[in-house]
Amino acid sequence: IPVGKDSMSMRTVWEQEGEALSNTAPLSLVISAFAPLQDIRDTLTPELKTTAGDTQLVLVDLGRGKNRLGGSALGQVFRTLEGTAPDLDSASDMLALFSLLKAARSEGILLAYHDRADGGLLTTAVEMAFAGRCGVTLDLAGAAPIEALFSEELGIVVQIGRADSERFTELANEAGLGDCTHTVAAVEANDAGRKNPRLTVLSHGETLYSASLSSLQRTWAETSYHMQK
């Protein structure tokens, strides 16, 4: 057994309408798989590339716009875990996602990759910005901000060159994922941006949020700091 898993004793406690409730997760089977890596230089990581010219972040949303918030980190912060939790509604979408990634990698158009997981799209973008030490501007367009930023639906975020955007869209359409593939952010690549990088969130052209990466990283590290004291 190469790794351990806490599902054998995982328990959660919460408060609902003044009553303390708890739930213990059922036993679950965990299968770990490994594969040889031919060349580590081809590895995709969350580190944003800042020397690739004009680039953007693209979300492939396997939740297909449902943006369910049940059980999310946002809900935990506000002590409310009600609502429908994210789920994989179509197993074929997962297979299609792997096909899309394989095709895009083979053409060399993927620069960075990260999953949308705990914390949702906002956390994904922040982690990628931390790794690349560069600014990111999220543009939510007409999406509901809270759901778009904090939903933990299955999905991935990839960095691609703007010149490759049309080709990536073609590949997504071929994989059957074109209608859930959206450009969500611009990556700051110039030197001025790297000196004082910021994370900015736009909606309908207005700034909803903006903060320096340094302040966000201090907040990010605070919990770990207190745990380690």
Regions found by a protein language model. Give the residues of each.
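Helix N-cap motif at beta-to-alpha junctions
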Residues: V157-E166
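Intein/HINT protein-splicing elements and their conserved insertion hotspots or analogous self-processing inserts
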Residues: V3-F150, S165-K229
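Short, solvent-exposed beta-strand edge segments and adjacent coil->beta transition regions
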Residues: E153-G155
